[in-house]
Amino acid sequence: MKKRVIILFLLFIFLLTTGFGCKLVDQKTQDAMKPINLNYWGVWNSQDDFTDILNAYKKLHPYITINYRKLRYDEYEKEIINALAEDRGPDIFSINNTWIKKYQTKITPMPATITMAYPVTKGAIKKEVVPELRTSKSLNLTDIKNNFVDAVYQDVVRQGFDEKNKQNKDSVYGLPLFVDTLAMYYNKDLLNNAGIALPPAFWNSEFQQAVKKTTIQDAQGGLIQSGTALGGSTNIERYSDILSALMMQNGAVMMDESNSVLFNRIPPAIKDQRYNPGLEALRFYTDFANPAKEVYCWNKNLGNSLKLFMQGKLAIFFGFSYHLPTIRAQAPKLNFGIAKFPQIEGNPPINFANYWVETVSNKSKYSSEAWDFIQFAARAEQAKTYLAKVKRPTALRSLINEQIDDQDIGIFAQQALTAKSWYKGADSAAAEQIFAEMIDTTVLAQDKIEDILNLAVGKVQQTVNVNGQ
């Protein structure tokens, strides 16, 4: 009998120390370490961009495999919507910051806590790796406010219905890996030739003089060289963002908390209640496409603003950091610089944010694991590696000072602290088209600018009201 007990004991020790220890782990832990495949869809990143993050995460959670798929922008939204409707969509997917409210019902918000299995080495003599369950707190609302630039909290924190507690509550619906901002690209040679030592910092007479000095017309009044890309619509990169930034800088309220579109109204905070900031911003913008104005430098017959800048025919171009690789690749000899987006002198600085967030589908069977990965990827130590590879401005406050001196992305990163955006409704593309119509109609009929502005606001409001969004 004694001999049998000794044999059984030795057998137990053998099983425990030869890799079969997991058999003795409780069922909950065994379930947590079963192989999991997370499908991740995006637009701008490649598999290589995420290699370092994926490898680092794999070391922590070897049983989780993340499959990244890059789609074309022009097919992305349609594919996402169809895939989610057919229950074949990704666990994690990227969306533009202005799409969050539109996709809110398709997203599982970040949970308060996440329980995950981690490999832990145990044993003094015979080392053995065994799984261990750990429950950790997710980022809370205060963390989002403190860790990320202000625009992030404004965009990713939304009120939704909490099924567990049967009440509305604020939750986090996505996290960004970067925040891009609108900046001023300028052709150094054209400014030098015009006797302009520094790019203008404000939208005042200095900017307008710079535009006049760098605009060249032929004998018939045709534009040979343009001082800046303002005043037009579809042939200007991100025209709606530029005009939105001008309106916000001038004091217009684009939308209130009740989702009412208001950029045609005079806000109560404006001292002169006869001054309409949204209307005057629209007038200022479209003056650059008005042949009767001294600052005339743009019309609908010109080519794309980015292409003209790369061809050396445009002195000042407004764009994001993502335009930089294109300029470098297609115009390697272009002598250009990057400066801050101009402001209204005497007003607090306001910049425009345009970025993407990573979020989790409410159809995912592994929402906790998906959110765990997103939070892991958004941490400073992981973000550093990613940002260095893709050359994008950070969304994290803690990394801004490290990027400020970067000649490529320093300006964009610094501006993130004062960047804002606004929700354009369930169909942001439709809202942008409404802005295009508003701009083009104003150029043709300046005397009807107030009616044009009011009509545009009404149309944008319709995009906001679709499906109760």
Predicted region positions:
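Hinge/lid segment of periplasmic solute-binding proteins
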Residues: I100-T181
